[in-house]
């Protein structure tokens, strides 16, 4: 029932409701809001690198460096405070994507003149080659784990478009045989191999707000993002009913907005302090209560590089006052 208290409880729990007799207000607690805070800067400025892991055990690797066509094979781990160099990737590349944890990650595709289909796995101490990806390889979308990943096409070598989707079992890639509905690259995806969410990206001639959901057998159109954007980088994570989509570039500007997905619709969350695109981010499946977003570029022409890291945290609860309207 509703408690009658002289003051707000010191340690309320989510869902608790009480009447504050001093302020004459009916109050309750709900799940807290998410916000971004400053983290440790990357040792190397880069954009379009891959990411994996969590806010306290993260991984960032590869990417484009200032002075195109410079690309990186550097790899760094994050402990929630600072970044530490780890063994380099075997192949330097920009626009690489990946997923997994800080000790079991997979990196896929990218550009090294021309686009490549290379797949590498990281085990916490070294990178090793795996079987090549068979689809469009630059700015593709990947989610899941090192041994059960889902990927949708990016930009194929040369010109053209493709909408194939693939799964990875820790050894090789397989074509699902079921294409997603709209060709786009530079989008973001979260979830697992049997339930994923694909949103945003660059369509031919326009920036996309479209969302598609994957149920293990087919793709279905979902609710559009509130803000259409591409050049998202490795910057979405969560599940098909609880996901996060961060930052990117609209047709005219780089944005820092965060949107949260509940399985049906998108809600605006807290903004990054530094709006940017093409950053490395946390793993693509798992909890949405914390994460990181590191590096990237902060201007619309995608030429101003930054090493900034920001950390996303959702508080356990917040107190709300009930009102009558």
What are these regions (language model features)?
Residues 1-325:
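Polar, enzyme-active/binding microenvironments
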């Amino acid at each position: 029932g509703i408690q009658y208290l002289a003051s707000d409880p010191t340690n309320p729990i989510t869902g608790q409701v009480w009447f504050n007799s001093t302020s004459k207000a009916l109050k309750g607690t709900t799940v807290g809001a998410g916000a971004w805070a400053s983290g440790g800067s990357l040792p190397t400025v880069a954009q379009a690198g891959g990411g994996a892991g969590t806010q306290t055990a993260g991984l960032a690797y590869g990417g484009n460096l200032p002075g195109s066509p410079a690309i990186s094979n550097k790899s760094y781990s994050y402990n929630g405070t600072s970044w530490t160099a780890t063994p380099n990737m075997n192949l330097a590349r920009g626009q690489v994507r990946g997923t997994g944890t800080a000790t079991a990650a997979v990196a896929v595709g990218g550009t090294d003149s021309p686009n490549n289909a290379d797949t590498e796995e990281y085990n916490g101490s070294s990178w090793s080659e795996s079987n090549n990806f068979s689809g469009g390889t630059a700015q593709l979308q990947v989610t899941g784990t090192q041994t059960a990943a889902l990927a949708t096409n990016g930009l194929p070598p040369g010109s053209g478009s493709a909408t194939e989707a693939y799964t990875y079992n820790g050894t090789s890639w397989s074509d699902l045989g079921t294409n997603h509905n709209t060709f786009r690259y530079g989008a973001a995806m979260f979830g697992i191999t049997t339930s994923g969410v694909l949103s945003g990206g660059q369509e031919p001639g326009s920036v996309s707000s479209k969302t598609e959901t994957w149920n293990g057998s087919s793709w279905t159109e979902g609710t559009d993002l509130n803000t259409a954007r591409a050049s998202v980088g490795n910057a979405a994570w969560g599940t098909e009913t609880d996901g996060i989509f961060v930052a990117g570039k609209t047709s005219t500007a780089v944005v820092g907005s965060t949107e949260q997905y509940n399985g049906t619709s998108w809600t605006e969350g807290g903004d990054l302090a530094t709006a940017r695109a093409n950053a490395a981010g946390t793993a693509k499946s798992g909890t949405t209560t914390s994460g990181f977003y590191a590096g990237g570029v902060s201007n619309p022409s995608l030429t101003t590089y930054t090493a900034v890291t920001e950390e996303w945290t959702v508080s356990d609860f917040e107190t709300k006052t009930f009102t009558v309207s």
